[in-house]
C-alpha cells in the first residue's frame, strides 16, 4: 500500500512542478510583445503627424486673443522705430 502511494506521489510531483513553472511564466511582468508595441507606436505617430499636417493646411488654428494681422516686414519696422525713438530722446542729467 505504501509502495503504491509513493509511486502515485512520484507521478504527481512532475505535474506539480510543471504547473508551478507555467504560473511563473504567466506572472512574469517583464515579458513584452515588442512587435505589437512597435506597430502601435508607429500607427500612433502617423495619426499625430497627419493631424498636425491637416491643422497646418486648414489654417483653422488661431490665437486665443484678438490680434490684427501684420505685414511681413512689420516686425522689422517696429524695431527700427524703437531704435530711432531712443536715439532722438534728450539725455536727462542725473544729480
Curated annotation (Swiss-Prot):
Gene3D superfamilies: Single helix bin (1.20.5.780). Residues 69-95 are annotated as: Disordered. One of its GO terms (molecular function) is sodium channel regulator activity. The keyword Repeat does not apply. Coiled coil: none annotated. Residues 19-35 are extracellular. Residues 58-95 are cytoplasmic. It comes from the Eukaryota. The chain crosses the membrane at residues 36-57. PROSITE patterns: FXYD. Keywords: Cell membrane, Ion transport, Membrane, Potassium, Potassium transport, Signal, Sodium, Sodium transport, Sodium/potassium transport, Transmembrane, Transmembrane helix, Transport. It is found in: Cell membrane. Residues 1-18 form the signal peptide. GO terms for cellular component: glutamatergic synapse; plasma membrane; postsynaptic membrane; presynaptic membrane. GO terms for biological process: positive regulation of sodium ion export across plasma membrane; potassium ion transport; sodium ion transport. It is a single-pass type I membrane protein. Pfam families: ATP1G1_PLM_MAT8. PANTHER family: FXYD DOMAIN-CONTAINING ION TRANSPORT REGULATOR 6-RELATED, SODIUM/POTASSIUM-TRANSPORTING ATPASE SUBUNIT GAMMA. Belongs to the FXYD family. Regulatory subunit of the sodium/potassium-transporting ATPase which is composed of a catalytic alpha subunit, a non-catalytic beta subunit and an additional regulatory subunit. The regulatory subunit, a member of the FXYD protein family, modulates the enzymatic activity in a tissue- and isoform-specific way by changing affinities of the Na+/K+-ATPase toward Na(+), K(+) or ATP. Associates with and regulates the activity of the sodium/potassium-transporting ATPase (NKA) which catalyzes the hydrolysis of ATP coupled with the exchange of Na(+) and K(+) ions across the plasma membrane. Reduces the apparent affinity for intracellular Na(+) with no change in the apparent affinity for extracellular K(+). In addition to modulating NKA kinetics, may also function as a regulator of NKA localization to the plasma membrane. This is FXYD domain-containing ion transport regulator 6. It comes from Homo sapiens. The gene is FXYD6.
Amino acid at each position: 500500500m505504501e509502495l503504491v502511494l509513493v509511486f502515485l506521489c512520484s507521478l504527481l510531483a512532475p505535474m506539480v512542478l510543471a504547473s508551478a513553472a507555467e504560473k511563473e511564466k504567466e506572472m512574469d511582468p517583464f515579458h513584452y510583445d515588442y512587435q505589437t508595441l512597435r506597430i502601435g507606436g508607429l500607427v500612433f505617430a502617423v495619426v499625430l503627424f497627419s493631424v498636425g499636417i491637416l491643422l497646418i493646411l486648414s489654417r483653422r488654428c488661431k490665437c486665443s486673443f484678438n490680434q490684427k494681422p501684420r505685414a511681413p516686414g512689420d516686425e522689422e519696422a517696429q524695431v527700427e522705430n524703437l531704435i530711432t525713438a531712443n536715439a532722438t530722446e534728450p539725455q536727462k542729467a542725473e544729480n
